[in-house]
A protein has these predicted regions:
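Conserved N-terminal catalytic core of the sugar/cofactor nucleotidyltransferase
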Residues: 1-11, 31-116, 123-128, 136-137
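Active-site metal-binding loops of divalent metal-dependent hydrolases
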Residues: 13, 120-121, 153
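A structural signal for short hydrophobic beta-strand segments in well-ordered beta-sheet cores
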Residues: 23, 168-170, 266
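Phosphate- and divalent-cation-binding pockets in alpha/beta enzyme and binding domains
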Residues: 58-59, 126, 225, 252, ...
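Conserved core of the sugar-phosphate nucleotidyltransferase
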Residues: 125-213, 220
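Conserved active-site beta-strand element of glycosyltransferases/polysaccharide synthases
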Residues: 217, 264-267, 275
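A C-terminal functional module that forms or caps the active site or interfaces directly
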Residues: 226-261
């Protein structure tokens, strides 16, 4: 069985954050959030990671160069023009095609199981251990065997604005039944709520709702499925919302679950999630990292020179 690799989804400039938030240091040693993810990933057993090539120079300077002696690094393009024959990129569109397309862009670099994370989210040590162990112990049989790390909604919202989250429903076996992408969730009057109509109406969500933070574990089979589904997505998306439609990775997983062709084990995380959606979130992350170091979960310098 091939060793699992790690795919890091790094978007471009953070539209809500204002700048390349993935390479903004979160401690006095100059580490960025991704350093902590890679440290946890290596500790769990990962030996290779893949990241977008567009920001290669910035990432090499921030992470790649110091990581090269600890882990193998591959850079891949997520090219907006890389779409199936018969389709055209709408004139003026600059927005990438979304998480499904980002993972599909890595197809030539992946030859076995892999995990997927966001570059700018702190997932915690247990999450990497759980996903690595799952991928090392499970293979496809009569169904695709995938996994996802689940977080409590209350641990994943910010005080500084709205966030997008995948809301999860599970069965008695702790497997994912479906996942619904809510693109605008925020704290309102002491409760957590979402809107689907630009704030005209709001619906409350329980604090202990399980959500996806885009930490997935897959066998290589998902790449074939992403490739097969992409034309269908484009047909619909380019008609309904040509400038902004996104090919969401969880939507493809949901389709496979509904068709009973895959299972996705939900691995509950004991770790609190931290992330920087807005500039105002940064002090919270800095304080959290400081406390995690105090508790002995991380050394002061992650990568000893």
């Amino acid at each position: 069985m091939k060793k699992p690799v790690l795919v890091i989804m790094a978007a471009g400039m953070g539209s809500r954050y204002g700048g390349l938030k993935q390479i903004d240091p979160v401690d006095k040693e100059g580490h960025i959030i991704m350093d902590f993810s890679l440290f946890d990933a290596k500790r769990a057993g990962f030996e290779k990671f893949i990241i977008k090539k567009e920001n290669e120079d910035s990432f090499r300077e921030a992470v790649g160069n110091r990581m090269a002696k600890y882990m193998e690094v591959s850079y891949v393009f997520q090219d907006i023009n890389n779409i199936p024959e018969g389709f055209e990129v709408p004139e003026g569109r600059v927005k990438p095609w979304g998480t499904g397309h980002a993972v599909l862009s890595c197809i030539d670099e992946i030859d076995g199981p892999f995990a997927v994370i966001n570059a700018d989210d702190y997932y915690g040590r247990h999450a990497f251990e759980a996903i690595y162990n799952y991928l090392s112990e499970h293979e496809d049989d009569d169904k695709y065997r995938y996994a996802m790390v689940g977080y409590l909604l209350k641990n994943t919202v910010t005080d500084n604005g709205h966030v997008a989250r995948g809301i999860c429903t599970t069965n008695e076996e702790g497997e994912l039944v479906n996942i619904t992408e809510r693109t605008r969730i925020e704290k309102r009057d002491g409760k957590i709520a979402f809107t689907e109509n630009d704030g005209e109406t709001w619906e409350n969500l329980p604090e202990d709702t399980l959500v996806s933070m885009n930490m997935w574990g897959f066998t290589r089979s998902i790449l074939d499925e992403l490739k097969a589904e992409f034309p269908q997505f484009l047909k619909k998306g380019l008609t309904e919302n040509p400038m902004k439609c996104e090919y969401f990775l969880p939507a493809v997983v949901s389709n496979l679950l509904e068709a009973d062709r895959a299972t996705a084990a939900v691995l509950p995380s004991e770790d609190k999630w931290y992330g920087v959606t807005y500039k105002e979130d940064k002090p919270v992350v800095v304080e959290a990292i400081r406390n995690l170091k105090k508790e002995g979960l991380y050394p002061e310098n992650l990568w000893e020179e």
